[in-house]
Amino acid sequence: MPSADATRGGGSAGSMGKGTLGAGDTLGHKSVLDKQRAAIEKLRAQNEQLKTELLLENKFSVRPGDPFAQALINRLQDEGDMLARKIVLEMRKTKMLDQQLSEMGSTLTTTRNNMGGIFSAKEQSTAVQKRIKLLENRLEKAYVKYNQSITHNKQLRESINNLRRERIMFESIQSNLERELAKLKRDMADMIQQANGAFEAREKAIGEMNALKAQADKEQQGFEEEWRQLTTIIEEDKKERERARAQELAMRERETQELLKMGTLSSAEKKKRITKGSWNVGYNKAMAQNVAAEKVEMYGQAFKRIQDATGIEDIDQLVNTFLAAEDQNYTLFNYVNEVNQEIEKLEDQINIMRGEINKYRETGRELDMTKSRELTEEEARLAASEAQSQLYEKRTDSALSMTTALKAGINDLFERIGCNTPAVRDLLGEEGVTEANLTAYLGIIEQRTNEILQIYAKRKAQQGTDGLAEALLAQPLTQPGNRIIIEPPSTTQEEEVEGLEPEPVEEDRPLTREHLESKVQRTLPRKLETAIKVRPAGADATGGKRGSPTRR
């Protein structure tokens, strides 16, 4: 029934008039108002037709006699009154909606003026497209760096594994060298112990040799002293005998001469001289016997001292003992010479062994230092590789977190603009935003944005407003002097915009989370300055109009 439709339309229009309305809601209200106006006009036409029919009925018959006609007239009058009341209510609602429409139109005009006119949507779409392309480019670069970092991380893992295998091999070699060094040290200790034993034996032999030498020298000195004494006694005895023999010969010659002279002497004188000569000869013999007895006594005393010293009573045995002692002394002398030669040989061997020990010590020390240095270098390289691997893992996690955040933002935008339809889900799959279908999601978002803009343009065309004509003719709503220009963000690096030298970027690995945070904190003000700016057409490009909004 038309009245019921109009009532429902009026109710919906009244409910939609509550709250603040956007541009899309305004277009919806306009279409509802048009429908309500058409319904009101239709009701007015029906009311006029009913009034005309009623007048025609009442013209010929003021009081119809037919009760059915009277009931119909009453019913029609009631319906006319009800429709009149509804018309009044609808007119009130129409006035209220017109007032809201005018308010929304003024709000829309003010918003458009603040945003820069009818071109703001197009410029925003262009800026969004540029931003999307820039983000896609950065995402592609991030993927490239991520793949490079994964490859480099794999190479570093292989290098770390090789270094670990080399470390195990070096540790095995070091353990073998340590065992060889310990064996050499044990051999060296044994050689030192043997050398010490040889030294002790040498010292002992030298001590015994010195004792034997001292004893032999002492015995030799005693023997030589006794021998000198005996030789002196024998020489003196020999001299005494020769002197006594010479005296005896001289006396015999004198006696012979005297006997020759006695031939002329008397017998008494002969007897006297013979007696005197006999006395002299006896005296000389007695003297010689006394001297020999003294020498024998002296020899006896000397032999007695030798016998007391040696404990040997027999002279032959004493002589044999003396000869045996001489032979033993000579044998000991030869033994001492042999021992000295052996000691010299042992000293030479000890010096050679000491040289070899020192050589092995130096070699072992150099080998230990070399192995220690190599081990330290390998540990440093391993620590650096592990630190670099951890750094790459952190950067990989940061890149993954950035990719995850980007996926979440794209999914949120995808849900907000109404792209999540069954057909799209069938096309893209149910797994959501992934690295494989990221560009497909962005393409659908772009397509949906263009569709929304086209729907908006069609609604404006249906309304036939001047704003749509200006939009179609690309004419600004505001005056040229007050035109607002939206500056798109720059695609150049912030350092190039500021005239600064760009930071050196290492291409072989992605940025770490700390580096990204510091870079964002450092470049965020410049990004805000280089973002989408709204400024008047006559204002300076760098300064802008005071109070003009900045859209990111």
From Swiss-Prot:
Any one GO cellular component localisation term in the record: outer dynein arm
Extent of Acidic residues compositional bias: 493-506
Location of this chain's protein in the cell: Cytoplasm, Cytoskeleton, Cilium axoneme
Sequence segments annotated as region (Disordered): 1-27, 482-515, 528-552
One Pfam family hit: ODAD1_CC
Major location category of this protein: cytoplasm
Key words of the record: Cell projection, Cilium, Coiled coil, Cytoplasm, Cytoskeleton
Coiled coil: 28-59, 120-260, 331-395
Disrupted-gene phenotype: Impaired motility and outer dynein arm defects.
UniProt KW Zinc keyword: no
GO biological process: cilium movement involved in cell motility; outer dynein arm assembly
Key word Coiled coil present: yes
Residue spans of biased composition, Gly residues class: 8-22
Role according to the record: Component of the outer dynein arm complex required for assembly of the outer dynein arm-docking complex (ODA-DC) and the outer dynein arm onto the doublet microtubule.
Assembly mode: Component of the outer dynein arm complex.
Family that this chain belongs to: Belongs to the ODA1/DCC2 family.
Protein name as catalogued: Outer dynein arm protein 1
Organism of origin: Chlamydomonas reinhardtii
Originating gene: ODA1
